[in-house]
Amino acid sequence: MIDRKLLLQDFDKVALSLKKRNNAMGDELERLHEVITHYKKQLIELEGLQAFQNKVSKEFGIKMAQKVDTSDLKKELENNKIKLNELSKSVGELEQQIDLKLSIIPNLVDEKTPLGASEEDNIEIKKILTPRNFTFKPKEHFELAQQNGWIDFESGVKLAKSRFSVIRGFGAKIYRALIHLMLDFNEKNGFEIIYTPALVNEKMLFGTGQLPKFKEDVFKIENENLYLIPTAEVTLTNLYNDTIVSVEKLPIKMTAHTPCFRSEAGSAGKDTRGMIRQHQFDKVELVAITHPKESDVMQEHMLESASEILKALELPHRFVQLCSADLGFSASNTIDIEVWLPGQNCYREISSVSNTRDFQARRAKIRFKENQKNQLAHTLNGSSLAVGRTMVALMENHQQADGSIHIPKALEKYL
C-alpha cells in the first residue's frame, strides 16, 4: 500500500504513477480526490474545534479556581464537544474510505522502470546460453510428455477439470528431482528452506496485495476465511506480518517449495494445451526482507540465483526488464527471466523477480528497528523456479530425434 501521507500531500505523483501503468482508475480516482479534499477540510475544522476546546477548558479551570460563574463556559464546552465528536466520527469515516481506496491502488512505478504501453515495450537486458540448432523439427512438450508417458493430461481433466495434469513414472522422478535441485541451489545461496501451509487467511492475502483487488484470481474455501495460496510469496512474506525485527537480522532470505493455485481468470483460450498455464502447479519461491538501501542489490542476487539453476540445467534464457504498463500490482520494479522453448520457437516467462519497496511492508506492517526507530522494510519475491515450466523447458531443449530426453549432468545425482 502506498503511504497515505503521500496521497494527501502529493496526489499528482500517485496519479502520474497510475498513468505510467496505463491505469488511470478513471472516475474512481476523481472520487478519491474529492474525498481527500473533503477530508483535508474537515481535518482543519477538527483541529480548530480541538484548539477551541483546549482554550475554553483552560479558561473554565481558571474561573473554577477563582469561584467565578462558569455556566456560559460549561455550555460552550458541551456544545463544542458535541460538534467535536460528530466531526471526529466523520473524519474517521473518511479515513476508512481513503484507506479502502488505497488498498486497490497499485504500487508506485520505480524510477528505474521504463515507460511502456504494453508487454511489447519490455526491454531485453541480456541472453544467457545460445539456443541449440536442431537437425530435426523440435516437438512441443505435450507431445514429448505423452510419447514418453510422463504426463497424463486426460486423467487431470477426469480428476478435476481442464488445466490440471497428472505426472507419473520417470516424469514424476524428474519433477521431484527438479524441486530438490532448486532448493539445494537456493540454500547454497543463503536462502533458508521453509515449508508453509498451502492455506492462508484473508489478512495474509491483503498483506501481499492479492486482496481485495484480485479476489477472482484465488480459490476460497467455502464457509471458511481461508484461501489456497497462489504463490509461496504470500506465506513467506507474511511470516513477518505485524513484526519488528532488529536491523542486524536483515536481510532475511527464504525459499519454499509449495503447490500454487490460481483460477486463471481472464486466461480463457491461452495455453490450453500442456503445462504452461495450470490451475495447480508447483513452484520454488524466493522471498527477501531487506533494509531499504539493500533491496536493489538483493533483486540482482535473486535473479542470479534463479539464473544459476537454468545454467546448471543447460537451458538458454534471457533477462527482460518489464515496462511500467506490464508491472504486477505490488511491484515497483520487475525483471523477468524467460526460458527458450524450441518447440514454440520463443522465450516464455519462467521467473519474475520483483522489488515491491515498502508497498507490501506497509500493508503487512513489516518493520525493522534501527537506532531505536522503527522503519518499514523492503520486500522482494521471485520464482526460483516454476517447476512445471522448468520441466517443459527441459523436455523441449534436451529432446532427441527419437523423442527421448537427455538428462543434464546437474540433475543426474537427484534421479
What function would you assign to each model-found segment?
Residues M1-R132, W150, E154:
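N-terminal alpha-helical targeting/anchoring segments
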Residues K127-L415:
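TRNA-recognition modules of translation machinery and tRNA-sensing kinases, especially anticodon-binding
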